[in-house]
Amino acid sequence: MSGLLKKKQRFSCNDILKIVSKYGTPLWVYDSNIIVKKIKELSQFDVIRFAQKSCSNIHILNLFYKYNVKIDAVSLGEIERALISKYRFTMDQDVVFTSDIIERETLNKVVQYKIPINIGSIDMLEQVGKISPGHNIWLRINPKFGHGHSKKTNTGGENSKHGIWDINLAFPYITKYNFKLIGLHMHIGSGVDYCHLKRVCKAMIDQVLQCKFKIHVISAGGGLTVPYHCNDEPVNVKNYFFLWNKARKIISNYLNRPIRLEIEPGRFLVAESGILVSEIRVIKKTNNRTFILVDSGFNDLIRPAMYGSYHHISVIPRDGRCVNYDDTIEAVVCGPLCESGDVFTQNEYGDIKTRILPNVQIGDFLVFHDTGAYGASMSSNYNSRPLIPEILFKDNEFHIIRRRQTMKELLELEINCI
């Protein structure tokens, strides 16, 4: 049997067969070696801050802690995950809370632990200031333009809810509540190209020139591209750093002080580390289509249904036979949900697309590649389906880092309520 198609993971098809025989399908598998490799690729930046929303398992966070990667949290739940994953909020801004809205319970938590807040709205400044004057804050700025691999991942411009539109409106509140302004942050979307990157760097310089307070840090945000297609070019990290470092030097010279440069990636660090393994349960034909139905759906991996995202798919035969790449079929790959949109091979407009795959049999496994980011963290219980296991390949061993949710656990919040 051939190894995994597409690249990267250090484990083999035989390893996957052993895992599914023990834990069943569907399931997630991550390779820690790839995560560590991606961390090292960003070593030129002063601070790497992981966008936890992309993959929030506490054992993944423990791995980041080991390599001195800090955390960006966007909810109370993510703050709690960071706390249980060894991060200490009093230690050199280990955790920053980023949001455009802050609920009362979350506000109480960030005040309790003195967590710096990356503030994305003027109303938040007032709400935080009344409870915690003198708090350490960042300002998230909307540079009035954005870009992403999908309209839904564009986080800048007048159609985006994210960030402060006019930085000048923030200054009276900073003075009124004696906030300590640490830095400025910009993130215009997921999947940023170099043309837009240059605009962001210039926009950051312009915002600092407007700022009435001397900051210490600038954040490049995230958005580094990931090569989901086999022929995609990986992002040039050196060029990415060069552009931001150039902006940092201009800002440092203007403020006459050292400026720390942070980057806040999510997908870049974890996407390529993960796979989703599913079993083929049905192969059906219509006049013009062949449909392959697997036991995972958009309740597990929602990116194709939500964004039209592409994930490379490879085949692992259940019986260990060799894959014959000369004997192929053109098929639509779907999940089990009672939902027409539960299709893994569709574009951003919802148009059904086919994928050329080796001829498969019932019981074979499909592997969806590059699902380490926004896979498990965006999964749900839709159709009352339990959350699936997560497995981490670390130190040449496979470790279960989330067991399969039981039906009892799924129903527990509702039983005995009345």
Curated annotation (Swiss-Prot):
InterPro entries: Ala_racemase/Decarboxylase_C, DAP_deCOOHase_LysA, De-COase2_C, De-COase2_N, Orn/DAP/Arg_de-COase, PLP-binding_barrel. The keyword Ligase does not apply. The keyword Transport does not apply. One of its GO terms (biological process) is lysine biosynthetic process via diaminopimelate. Keywords: Amino-acid biosynthesis, Decarboxylase, Lyase, Lysine biosynthesis, Pyridoxal phosphate. Its EC number is 4.1.1.20. Disulfide bonds: none annotated. Its cofactor is pyridoxal 5'-phosphate. It comes from the Bacteria. Substrate binds at R267, R303, Y307, E339, Y374. The modification N6-(pyridoxal phosphate)lysine is found at K53. The active site is at C338 (proton donor). Specifically catalyzes the decarboxylation of meso-diaminopimelate (meso-DAP) to L-lysine. Homodimer. This is Diaminopimelate decarboxylase.
